[in-house]
Amino acid sequence: MKQPLISFKHVVKSYDDDVQVLKDVSFDIEEGKFYTLLGPSGCGKTTILNIIAGLSDATSGDVYFDGKRINDVPANKRQVNTVFQDYALFQHLNVYDNIAFGLKIKKVPADKIKEKVTEALRMVRLDGYEDRAISEMSGGQRQRVAIARAIVLDPKVLLLDEPLSALDQKLRAEMQYELRSLQKKLGITFIFITHDQEEALAMSDEIFVLNNGNIVQSGTPVDIYDEPINHYVADFIGESNIVNGIMIKDELVEFAGQQFPCVDGGMKPNEPVEVVIRPEDLVLTSPEKGQLKVKVDTQLFRGVHYEIRCTDALGNKWLVHSTKRAVPGENIGLSFGPEDIHVMRFNESEEDFDARLDSYND
């Protein structure tokens, strides 16, 4: 098995008031992938980034880079660079000198600096902007300058601390494509932190979902979206319908007063569970044809779909994304298939969750 590029082994970070920001965190980062640390403010994602960068020390535990323990290695000796949320550009320097700054500090020859800065500008599509003042650049252009300044030093890892948060929605979407494309061109490891689940789903090879100093679940965007480990992940990653249920037996679950075939298994008979169905997986139909009968409460037009909120006979609330319209107050049916149902156990560890999925997916 290939050695991880970065490893955290039982890392804890505490402050003087004994508040634990990271609680026994362990994970591996492989070379050449795009990773996202995803979670709300205060979950510990920025602390992980700072420990990797050498800007903060772990209270206990070990951090490895290329198989070597780096807890005591200073920040300037680590093969990582950081793009900060505010970009941290020098306003008194033009674009060229901002990008060249780190190379000059390292006393790289002038001709080599010019070659590397020119290549970095080409990579971020800012050819010809060498003499432009930072104050004359748009938000998206400033971000590209910050990225060029980071990649010009040939890091093995690029750390990105919520760099899209200050941009408007359209520009954020454009920069998601650009960052993903740039990572593939460079072939280096990107570690991106955000609280925006859409950014994480769009760009990542792997996502680490954090909450309260713990990594709750890790996996590909598809795995985490389709098979969240618990209520927190299901609710945080996209919109979800989450209702209480009973796992009758393998591939049969009860919720909303009825039993439905599903694709989940490996649980105890009649075990209390939570059931997730994504809004886009619910299909509007007539009450007679629907597996669930519901009453429409409200409807909003969102451009690409209608957002329809409904209530079933037991009081469960359902959110539906549909291209079909519904009328508030009318009774309708909701249709879905076994593969649209995801069943979650209470208090299941990620290790047990992965083992259970493997047991019935093989």
UniProtKB/Swiss-Prot annotation:
Q: Cellular location of this protein? A: Cell membrane
Q: Read off the InterPro entries from this record.
A: AAA+_ATPase (IPR003593), ABC_SmlMolc_Importer (IPR050093), ABC_transporter-like_ATP-bd (IPR003439), ABC_transporter-like_CS (IPR017871), Mo/tungstate-bd_C_term_dom (IPR008995), P-loop_NTPase (IPR027417), PotA_ATP-bd (IPR017879), Transp-assoc_OB_typ2 (IPR013611)
Which reaction equation describes what this protein catalyses? Answer: ATP + H2O + polyamine-[polyamine-binding protein]Side 1 = ADP + phosphate + polyamineSide 2 + [polyamine-binding protein]Side 1
Q: Which Gene3D superfamilies match?
A: 2.40.50.100, P-loop containing nucleotide triphosphate hydrolases
Tell me which residues make up the ABC transporter domain: 6-237
> What keywords appear on the UniProt entry?
ATP-binding, Cell membrane, Membrane, Nucleotide-binding, Translocase, Transport
**Which superkingdom is the protein from?**
Bacteria
Annotated residues that bind ATP are located at 39-46
Under Enzyme Commission nomenclature, its number is: 7.6.2.11
Q: Fetch the PROSITE patterns from UniProt.
A: ABC_TRANSPORTER_1, ABC_TRANSPORTER_2, POTA
Is the keyword Heme in the record? no
Protein's membrane topology: Peripheral membrane protein
Pfam families given for it? ABC_tran, TOBE_2
Which GO-annotated molecular functions does the record name? ABC-type putrescine transporter activity; ATP binding; ATP hydrolysis activity
SMART domains attached here? AAA
Described purpose of this protein according to its UniProt entry? Part of the ABC transporter complex PotABCD involved in spermidine/putrescine import. Responsible for energy coupling to the transport system.
**Which family is this sequence assigned to?**
Belongs to the ABC transporter superfamily. Spermidine/putrescine importer (TC 3.A.1.11.1) family.
Cite the record's note on assembly. Answer: The complex is composed of two ATP-binding proteins (PotA), two transmembrane proteins (PotB and PotC) and a solute-binding protein (PotD).
Q: What is this protein called?
A: Spermidine/putrescine import ATP-binding protein PotA
Q: Which organism is it from?
A: Ligilactobacillus salivarius (strain UCC118)
